[in-house]
Amino acid sequence: MDEIRASILRVQLKKLPTVISHMHDSKYRIRTALGQHSEIRHRRIVDPDGDTGCFLLTTFKDPDITKQINRALRAEGIVTLAQGVNDIVMTQWGLHIYYNIPSLVHKTGVDKRNSPWSLVENKDSRTKYGKGTCPVADGLFERTILLAIPSCLTDRDEQDIIHAFEKVLTSFGD
């Protein structure tokens, strides 16, 4: 790494605790406000202090309701610019979903030896990684909305998100 990049990185790394703190605080304020809605099941956070807060995941009872709620939230303005990926049903999350990763599905190695698939430990592996391999995860993907939490949300932005959720959830009946 040259000196210019290193100096930029050094400055940016100093900002990281503030960025993470802002995301974390925004996420938990929104999450707490939505806690009164019984139809939302929030993801269990194993390490709340270690959670950066970059995503709010809300899970609903079935895929159809999830899609309807997602469309309604987007109609309320909970979206990003065209280049952003936000307020989506997790099945739309591209390469972050196991069955959308070509190198995993096709067992493409990372080197000339086709590792890790050519390793002795994997020689008898018959596992397929297409959709349906992990039905519990697949079900969660279909029933979960992913909302990215930027570090620059204002109090007004947070209230707009909370209001949109409350309006949409009220229209679906609590």
Question: What annotation goes with each model-predicted range?
Answer:
Residues M1-D174:
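PLP-dependent aminotransferase class I/II
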